[in-house]
Amino acid sequence: LGAIGAGDIGDHFPDTDPKNKNLDSSAIVMHAIRLAIEKKLILNNLDITLLLESPKISDQEYKITMKRNILEMFFEVFHICCPDIISKTNPRNIFTDDMINIKASTSESLGFIGKGQGVTCYCIVSLKNLNNEH
């Protein structure tokens, strides 16, 4: 949302709205993807850093699964929002797993994260103009 100047999660999914209680986070991600596409912007690069004690994210299979799930959200929204482009280009040629980097670190047992009481995620999103892709 920040990469497209669309405020924050609370602007779109207020915690005062009961329907947002226990909302699947993929709904938030897909909403942000749709808003970006409406502004003619698509993913250039996504860099994710997870800060947690467990589970250990160093396992490549876990990272591959996370990337696959993220890419599937892009494909699903792109199919809905861009049928004209889909007719010309396979979105799997537009969104590839090398556009997403996932890494993890611990807080070396410090603070609430180090005690296993929470997780932090930092993301940097780079977008590009959709019109340059097809």
Language-model features and meaning:
Residues A3-G5, S109-G116:
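Short glycine/serine/threonine-biased micro-segments
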